[in-house]
Amino acid sequence: MTLWMASPPEVHSALLSSGPGPGSVLSAAGVWSSLSAEYAAVADELIGLLGAVQTGAWQGPSAAAYVAAHAPYLAWLMRASETSAEAAARHETVAAAYTTAVAAMPTLVELAANHTLHGVLVATNFFGINTIPIALNEADYARMWTQAASTMATYQAVAEAAVASAPQTTPAPPILAAEAADDDHDHDHDHGGEPTPLDYLVAEILRIISGGRLIWDPAEGTMNGIPFEDYTDAAQPIWWVVRAIEFSKDFETFVQELFVNPVEAFQFYFELLLFDYPTHIVQIVEALSQSPQLLAVALGSVISNLGAVTGFAGLSGLAGMQPAAIPALAPVAAAPSTLPAVAMAPTMAAPGAAVASAAAPASAPAASTVASATPAPPPAPGAAGFGYPYAIAPPGIGFGSGMSASASAQRKAPQPDSAAAAAAAAAVRDQARARRRRRVTRRGYGDEFMDMNIDVDPDWGPPPGEDPVTSTVASDRGAGHLGFAGTARREAVADAAGMTTLAGDDFGDGPTTPMVPGSWDPDRDAPGSAEPGDRG
């Protein structure tokens, strides 16, 4: 609610008195009253007409059907007459509230007079003689401020309540025969029936969201007084709202019948599939044919979905294919782990004889292998071996591969399968074993250190056969005269003494006086006996 106390009374009085006044509101109330009277007159005329039909020459089933078809319209006329009369009363209430507010509001003339009197009292307030009248004038202005704010608050509350309680007029229902609802549908399912509290809640939400433009009657199965079957234009948004409500009610009916009578439930469902849903699909197709843009969008979505379906169908076809049968390989006889060298060339006579003479000390199976130098007989025609699709035969057993599965940079050499290679590997293993045995006998400590227990006197002279090197002396050039003022500078600079070793022991017999540079006078007296010229 607006905070009316925040504004002075001049603002409220000016806004309230400068408007069009209650004339427009009273005019609207008069129109609603005349509309209510017109509805009542039409209802009375229709009642007389229906009575005449029932009692006249049209008496019979046709007259009864005529009266039954006009019954919803007659009820709507009576309800509309009452609604219009109530709306007129609400407008009159708002007009009365406005008139009361104008009468209770302080006028601009009264407010101007209060301000004028206040200025005069303040101007003639000599020695405080107008203090009491000024206080009374200010109190009267505060009263008018409060009165204006309360008047506006009361007027707002009454007007908002009247507008909020004004009823809404529903659209007029069509005048149709009782069997007209079956023209579009060839089934007899009802969209009304036993309404639930949830249905009324949904109906109220629809009415609030649409601003009173969607009035669903769950008991009668109508939208804005029109049956669901009469909405046939799928291009209108209300068609989709009606279809959503219809499908939800159909599903609710199916579930209820499923627990009571499953046979009737499935019969109801098949009726929907055969008659109701195809009708709505035809309505959608008609709406799309009237809008080419919507038709293009719908066809695009359908084509994309069909493409996905065909793709899955192809995958399902692949699932039914049987893999090609691969002939089983002929079993290969197991070879011994260590093959003799003579088995590499069984078809060569001369090398085979030489190797046979060299392998004489070998075992009996090796000798029999060497002796069989003739080629092996061809395989039987019925046992077909595995064929290679290349003109060159694959490598034989023992052929090394050039590829390596190791992650190291060094490439592994193919392992030889000869006796010489086996002997070389055994020799390498023996050498490694002997090296490990020798390493075990050695002592290896990581914390050992060298003992320097030999005294050597340094020789600072030049090497034999070479000229002596000039010893290091202090330079006589540099920053100039340094020291205190009045002190004498020594020109003679002594040589560096170098490293000096002093004899002594650990019991206090060593030197106690620190060494000083050679340029210092060792015979110098105590500091108290120095000459005056040597100090600053």
From Swiss-Prot:
Disordered: annotated span: 501-536
SUPFAM superfamilies: PE/PPE dimer-like
Pfam families for the chain: PPE, PPE-PPW
Residue ranges, compositional bias (Basic and acidic residues): 521-536
InterPro entries: PPE-PPW_C (IPR043641), PPE_dom (IPR000030), PPE_sf (IPR038332)
Gene3D superfamilies: PPE superfamily
Coiled-coil portions: none
GO BP of this protein: response to host immune response
Cysteine disulfide links: none
Miscellaneous comment text of the record: Was identified as a high-confidence drug target.
Family of the protein in this entry: Belongs to the mycobacterial PPE family.
Protein name, per record: Uncharacterized PPE family protein PPE3
Organism of derivation: Mycobacterium tuberculosis (strain ATCC 25618 / H37Rv)
Taxonomic path: Bacteria, Bacillati, Actinomycetota, Actinomycetes, Mycobacteriales
